C-alpha cells in the first residue's frame, strides 16, 4: 500500500491507497512539527484505522510548506524505513507545463492536474481548489498545463478582516442563506462566501474564453471548502481526493 501526504498551508492531508482505491483519509495541523511528532502521528493514525504501518510499501509527499519537508522526510525514514518520493521540480508528471518558470507551479496544483487528466482524459479542464488559497488551473485536452489564477481562500479572507481591523470578529466559514447580513458576523460571512463565489464565476468565464477559446470544458472542484459551493452550479464534479490521487499517480510514474 502507498501512503500519500499533501502538506498544505493549514493542514497535512493524507490517505492510504491499496492499488487505486483509497482506504483511509486523515488531517493534521501543518504547523511545524518535529520528525518524531510527525512519525508518531502517522503510525498512530494508521493503527487507529486498522491499517498496520508494516503494510506501507511506499510513501509519496506533495508539499507547499518547505519548513515541514525535512521533518516529514526524516519521520518517514525513521518510523517506516522508507525514503519517500517528493513531488517536486524535475520529476515526471506527464504534463507540458507552460508557466514561464515551471518551477514556480505549486506541487499541489501539479498533483491536481495529473489526477484530473488521468481521470478525465482528452478534455479541457479547469480545476478549482478551495483551500487556504483558492486556485484555478487550466489544463488542455493535450495535457498542457496552461496556467491559472490564485486568490485568497475563504478562511484567509475572513481572517484578514479580523486581524487587520479593530472591531470585526473572527467568524465561522459557512454558506449563508441570505446575501444581506443582519449582523456583523452574518455580513462578514455573506461577503466572504458570495465574494469568492462571484470571483469564481468571473474567473471561470474569463479562463474559458482566454485559455480555451470558448471550447467545451470540464470543471472540477476539490479542497476543504469545495462542498460549500455544491449547489451553486460552479463545477461539474466534486473530487475531494484529487490531490491525493495525483500524488499517487506521480509516485507510480517516478518509482519502481
From Swiss-Prot:
Q: Which InterPro entries does this one have?
A: ATPase_NBD (IPR043129), Type_III_PanK (IPR004619)
Keyword match ATP-binding: yes
What is the cofactor note? A monovalent cation. Ammonium or potassium.
Its principal location?
A: cytoplasm
Q: Where does K(+) bind?
A: 129
Can you say where in the cell this protein is located? Cytoplasm
Q: Name one GO biological process term.
A: coenzyme A biosynthetic process
**Stretches that traverse the bilayer:** none
Q: Which GO terms describe its molecular function?
A: ATP binding; metal ion binding; pantothenate kinase activity
Essential cofactor(s)? NH4(+); K(+)
Catalytic center residues: 108 (proton acceptor)
Assembly notes: Homodimer.
Q: What is this protein called?
A: Type III pantothenate kinase
